[in-house]
Design a protein with these regions (language model features):
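Extracytoplasmic metal-acquisition and chelation regions
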Residues: 20-323
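Bacterial N-terminal signal peptides
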Residues: 4-15
Length: 323
């Protein structure tokens, strides 16, 4: 009898130990935008399974949830979004799922309010914080903590991945500053389709002017086109930039208006603003997006693109492998 009881207890202990040591399934993460989803993948590694809602060319200001998106949210363990009304039309859906499961607005959780750019519109805050790499890197420790709370067995992995990735972001931040500094001072003006580069301009010392407002929901009128054409002509701006998520017609309208005033200006290239590029392309990661943007800006405005720092050599090698 005693032997039977001993065997039973031993079996229960072994089963309990096996359950405790059994690996947890990957944390199912849904991120609204690529600039969050990519960082979630870098921090989470094999301990997370990330789905990004809005792909290349997606406009978070105008995006509305489909029935498929609602199913994706329902299947998630946790939901990550930018906050500050970037995904304005998803607000009701995010609020509803926030009552059901961990839902994190990464920007308000990670970035001090005094670091924000305030604007005089119904949003009150410029939500494009990822344009300042040093500022956006603050979401990394937030994600480390958030993921560790839900998968404590992977906490060490999250910490190591987060620290390594943040070193890359620090190197990228310095490289962008050095790159922009090579542009002649009188040409250091960035004209874009909409006003998404305010944090970029503040962080890297380049004047930024958007044809459209902070949100693509705002309309561009004839007065806006004329005002911008006057600025471009008076400042002798060498190039304007289109954006991957916005129809280029407003930029082309400004170019036409500038030419009517007897001046010439061209398109300096396409920039990634509210979405990253296709996977496997130069802008298909967060680091790649900012690297591609900076390379195009510097080249078009008369600067010289410096070599990448050693801390980004691993990223550059992985990009070449993906091509």
């Amino acid at each position: 009898m005693r032997a039977a009881v001993f065997l039973l207890l031993a079996g229960l202990m072994l089963a309990s130990t096996a359950r405790a040591e059994a690996p947890s399934p990957p944390l199912r993460v849904v991120a609204t935008i690529g600039m969050i989803g990519d960082i979630a993948e870098r921090v989470g590694g094999e301990c997370v399974e990330v789905t990004t809602l809005m792909g290349p060319g997606g406009d978070p200001h105008l995006y509305q949830a489909s029935a498929g998106d609602v199913r994706t949210f329902r299947q998630a363990d946790t939901i990550l979004h930018a906050g500050y009304s970037l995904e304005g039309r998803l607000g009701e859906v995010l609020t509803r799922f926030g009552r059901m499961k961990p839902t994190l607005a990464v920007a308000p959780e990670s970035i001090a309010r005094e670091r924000l750019i305030t604007v005089q519109d119904r949003y009150g805050v410029d939500p494009h914080l990822w344009m300042d790499v040093g500022l956006w890197s603050n979401i990394v420790p937030t994600l480390v903590t958030h993921f560790s709370e839900q998968r404590p067995g992977c906490a060490g992995t999250f910490r190591a991945n987060g620290a390594a990735y943040r070193r890359e972001l620090q190197a990228l931040d310095g490289w962008i500053s050095a790159s922009i500094a090579t542009i002649p001072a009188r040409q250091r003006i960035l004209v874009t389709a909409h006003d998404a580069f305010g944090y970029y301009g503040r962080a890297y010392a380049i004047e930024v002017v958007g044809i459209q407002g902070i949100s693509t929901e705002t309309e561009t009128g004839v007065a806006d086109i004329r005002r911008m054409a006057r600025i471009v002509s008076e400042r002798n701006v060498p190039a304007l930039f289109i954006e991957s998520t916005i129809n280029p017609r407003t930029v082309q309208a400004v170019i036409n208006a500038v030419r009517q005033q007897g001046h010439e200006v061209g398109i300096g290239g396409e920039l990634y603003s509210d979405a990253m590029g296709e996977a496997g392309t130069p802008g298909g990661t967060y680091i790649g997006m900012l690297h591609a943007n900076t390379t195009r800006i510097v080249s078009a405005l008369g600067g010289e693109v410096p070599a990448l720092p050693a801390a980004l050599e691993g990223w550059a090698a992985s990009e070449q492998e993906g091509e």
